[in-house]
Amino acid sequence: MMDESLCGGLPPEICEQLSVEEQIIKIRLEKRRFGREVTIIEGINEKEFNLKKLASTLKSRLATGGTAKNGRIELQGDHRHRVKKILVELGFPEENITIID
């Protein structure tokens, strides 16, 4: 998943974990037309993580629709706190995930 030159000879597992720990993830709510709410997840490096696969995982766990585009994940509805819990379960450090109210 990671480029070998970025790891400096570290094992891929350690390099991948370091990459996850460096992510600063912001979760916010955006109001759209007709009062619809969309949860926006930003700050995940799309070069290191497959955003479409992560979006698919979140959509199935939350039973909602959504998409991954423009370097961010958009989920239909207000799922800010549940998304944070799922991202922590997937290995992202809780202190690097911010919910913007």
Swiss-Prot record:
It comes from the Archaea. Pfam families: SUI1. GO terms for biological process: formation of translation preinitiation complex; regulation of translation; translation reinitiation. Disulfide bonds: none annotated. Keywords: Protein biosynthesis, Translation regulation. GO terms for molecular function: mRNA binding; translation initiation factor activity. Belongs to the SUI1 family. This is Protein translation factor SUI1 homolog. It comes from Aeropyrum pernix (strain ATCC 700893 / DSM 11879 / JCM 9820 / NBRC 100138 / K1).
